[in-house]
UniProtKB/Swiss-Prot annotation:
InterPro entries: P-loop_NTPase (IPR027417), T6A_TsaE (IPR003442). Keywords: ATP-binding, Cytoplasm, Magnesium, Metal-binding, Nucleotide-binding, tRNA processing. Its main location: cytoplasm. It comes from the Bacteria. The keyword Transcription regulation does not apply. It comes from Rickettsia conorii (strain ATCC VR-613 / Malish 7). GO terms for molecular function: ATP binding; metal ion binding. This is tRNA threonylcarbamoyladenosine biosynthesis protein TsaE. Mg(2+) binds at residues 38, 104. It is found in: Cytoplasm.
Length: 175
């Protein structure tokens, strides 16, 4: 786990992760209420759509979409989903076709998702501090390697990011 000491560091990490994302990526955001999932998504969306983009939390309507240059960002908040099948009523199959998907509260549908996935786990501490881990289960020598190298070599943080690699065929990589 990496400690993000301020809102600014959380923004930096979200934008850093965004730089490695591409169409067809699925990012799962986990954490309690107030952990910063929507804030993290907002920064990813701003990276692709511009700083002045009006970003609305999908808490009440479960889905917001944003047009990036060559794909759409589907931002889901599944907190109020009653059954996993409801995700299909929210355009999920369409979202899987060449778009970037951000899912808050993904636990209810996680069993429906196939790798590769990127999980961002956030835990609120005090004074805008967060604990954060990023886990990916990309296969070896795929996007995961470039994601890890990119995050680890970033000059945006004063300390080196703690990234652990699992050597299993479908690897979990933790920040």
């Amino acid at each position: 786990m990496h400690t993000l000491n301020s809102e600014e560091e959380t923004k930096k990490l979200a934008k850093l992760l965004a730089q490695s994302l591409k169409p067809n990526d699925i990012v799962l955001l986990n954490g309690d209420l107030g952990a910063g999932k929507t804030f993290f998504c907002r920064e990813i969306i701003k990276y692709f759509c511009g700083e002045n983009t009006s970003i609305i939390s999908p808490t009440f309507n479960l889905l917001q979409t944003y047009k990036a240059s060559n794909f759409t960002i589907y931002h889901y908040d599944l907190y109020r989903l009653k059954s996993p099948e409801e995700i299909y009523e929210l355009g999920f199959e369409e979202a899987l076709n060449g778009n970037l998907i951000l899912i808050e509260w993904s636990e209810i549908i996680k069993h429906l998702l196939t790798p590769p996935l990127i999980e961002v786990n956030l835990e609120a501490l005090d004074n805008n501090k967060r604990l954060c881990s990023i886990i990916t289960n990309h296969k070896e020598n795929s996007q995961e390697s470039s994601l890890i190298d990119f995050l680890q070599d970033s000059p945006l943080f004063d300390t080196k990011l703690d990234i652990q690699r699992d050597k299993s065929p479908t690897r979990k990589v933790k920040l």
